[in-house]
From Swiss-Prot:
Chain residues that bind chlorophyll a PD1: H198
Enzyme Commission no: 1.10.3.9
Protein name as catalogued: Photosystem II protein D1
Membrane topology field: Multi-pass membrane protein
Keyword Acetylation: yes
UniProt xrefs under PANTHER family: PHOTOSYSTEM II D2 PROTEIN, PHOTOSYSTEM II PROTEIN D1
HAMAP family in alphabetical order: PSII_PsbA_D1
Origin species: Chlorella ellipsoidea
Enzyme class, first EC level, given as a word: oxidoreductase
Positions contributing to Fe cation binding: H215, H272
GO CC annotations, alphabetized: chloroplast thylakoid membrane; photosystem II
Length: 352
């Protein structure tokens, strides 16, 4: 009899736990994805803060030349970063218990791999949690779909690119100047500026910013007057009100006359779908471009593609970019190799 009561009590506790986890009445929705999201993101955030402040230098290139990225070693907020895992580790899974000591783990950049792996799991679970909450509220799933764009971008630079290049040391450093260094080296090695998927990403990000500003300014400029001159326009809106707060016909008429009639949306639903889809698709393409360049399917090479009747090269902007790429490649990882691969792998051009 006692055993039966205990089983019923435990089942009741589990049922109450399940109900609490999936309840949409909580101030913050947890969900089953949240059960994994919360510890992984807390771990990634905690280790990042500690490592950014106090972790020792890391032998990123695997040549016994540690690189400092931490505040206590003389860096500031801009120059500081969590330095990627050492090239000596490559793609090996490198938890703390795989190192001979904590000092070795820190020297080889173990915190970077710990942060990146937990962060990746956390943001994937956050996306799943968005879908889960939408499902429970009877909403459509497009919030999670939109969030998949930054998830894809983070996955590309933190997971796919290191896999393609064969080492976590090629991942993006976790810092401001480290991000810029990653971008410069990426351009030098992969010519990303000449990759069509990157161009689509630029169109998505800048186009999305433009469309967001246009939409916000049009709505703000065509608000329906509900207040006096002495009150804030924002006081004219009541949360949950049924009627429109702005005149879409006026906004449509203005924009149609400013550009041309069919440049303006006359359907609010299709307008907002467009505002969401444009940057999301652009960022998807950029993430896809990073993922293909990870395996050295690089941007277009139009170097020395224009010549005169005598066979002499007429430089184009592609050649100017190529010169910049060579200069950047010479400068990075100065002691890891003695000569840039692009210069060392071809016959030296004749100077005379």
């Amino acid at each position: 009899m006692t055993a039966i009561l205990e089983r019923r009590e435990s089942a009741s506790l589990w049922a109450r736990f399940c109900e609490w986890i999936t309840s949409t009445e909580n101030r913050l929705y947890i969900g089953w994805f949240g059960v994994l999201m919360i510890p992984t993101l807390l771990t990634a955030t905690s280790v990042f803060i500690i490592a950014f402040i106090a972790a020792p230098p890391v032998d990123i290139d695997g040549i016994r030349e540690p690189v400092s990225g931490y505040l206590l070693y003389g860096n500031n907020i801009i120059s500081g970063a969590v330095v990627p895992t050492s090239n000596a580790i490559g793609l090996h899974f490198y938890p703390i218990w795989e190192a001979a000591s904590l000092d070795e783990w820190l020297y080889n950049g173990g915190p970077y791999q710990l942060i990146v792996c937990h962060f990746f799991l956390g943001i994937c679970c956050y996306m799943g949690r968005e879908w889960e909450l939408s499902f429970r509220l009877g909403m459509r799933p497009w919030i999670a779909v939109a969030y998949s764009a930054p998830v894809a971008a983070a996955t590309a630079v933190f997971i796919i690119y290191p896999i393609g290049q064969g080492s976590f040391s090629d991942g993006m450093p976790l810092g401001i100047s480290g991000t810029f260094n990653f971008m410069i080296v990426f351009q030098a090695e992969h010519n990303i500026l000449m990759h069509p998927f990157h161009m689509l990403g630029v169109a998505g990000v800048f186009g999305g910013s433009l469309f967001s500003a246009m939409h916000g300014s049009l709505v703000t400029s065509s608000l329906i007057r509900e207040t006096t001159e002495n009150e804030s326009r924002n006081a004219g809106y009541k949360f949950g009100q049924e009627e429109e707060t702005y005149n879409i016909v006026a906004a449509h008429g203005y924009f149609g006359r400013l550009i041309f009639q069919y440049a303006s949306f006359n359907n609010s639903r299709s307008l907002h779908f467009f505002l969401a889809a444009w940057p999301v698709v652009g960022i998807w393409f950029t993430a896809l471009g990073i993922s293909t360049m990870a395996f050295n399917l690089n941007g277009f090479n139009f170097n020395q593609s224009v010549v005169d009747s005598q066979g002499r090269v007429i430089n184009t902007w592609a050649d100017i970019i190529n010169r910049a790429n060579l200069g950047m490649e010479v400068m990075h990882e100065r002691n890891a190799h003695n000569f840039p691969l692009d210069l060392a792998s071809v016959e030296a051009p004749s100077i005379a």
